From Swiss-Prot:
The gene is rrg9. It comes from Pyrenophora teres f. teres (strain 0-1) (Barley net blotch fungus). Required for respiratory activity and maintenance and expression of the mitochondrial genome. Belongs to the RRG9 family. Pfam families: Neugrin (PF06413). It is found in: Mitochondrion. This is Required for respiratory growth protein 9, mitochondrial. Keywords: Mitochondrion, Transit peptide.
Amino acid sequence: MSCHNCSRTALGLFIRSLTNLQPTFAARRPLIHPQPLRFLSDARRPRKVESVSRPDGVNPDTEIEDTLSGEGFPNKRERPAWAIQKEALKEKLGGEAWNPRKKLSPDTMEGIRHLNSTQPDKFTTPVLAEHFKVSPEAIRRILKSNWKPSDKEYEERMERWNKRGERIWSNLVEMGVKPPKRWRDMGVGRARDGNVPRWKSTERNLVDVKDSASSDFTNYIPDEDIIPTVGKDGKSKPITSSIPLSERL
């Protein structure tokens, strides 16, 4: 009986020893900061450039003094004249688009480009602006533009130009202003039902039509030596202002 108990005790101790196994090696703790993998690659890591703090009260546009020569040179290059004029015009217009009161016809603008391209020293921007009674900014924009319309675009452009002239002269006819022959042939100002046109009545010329140019061109006389007036035969002819009044009567 004692042998049976001894065997049971020995068997129990053996089973208990199997169930309460202690690990031989200590458990590995997880890494708090895992190390990046090292491998070969052609790509270079971007280096972090530390920004240099600028002292207080220093303007980046101020001159930088050369440490070797002791001379100062501008940090920012000088702006061209056209950029200064563009900024001044933008401030003058108050952010609105460029929309001059006086607009030149497409043929006139093409003639301005032709004059400047053939003789740029003679037909400068101030000379063209004075002759065509527009601002130098308008001449500069015309000369800067290199856009050329196609045949279809040219026809549509001329059609819009004719409609614009017809609308303007129709409004002037209502004010008693006589339209030019070109617009009269197109039917502008034509009376209906046998009535007399408004520009032929006693209410004619009640509105003083002035040019949209500035007052600087009030006493303007075209210079025939710069741009001569040519007649139908292709020969130069004197302007009316150069002919004495006694010869014109």
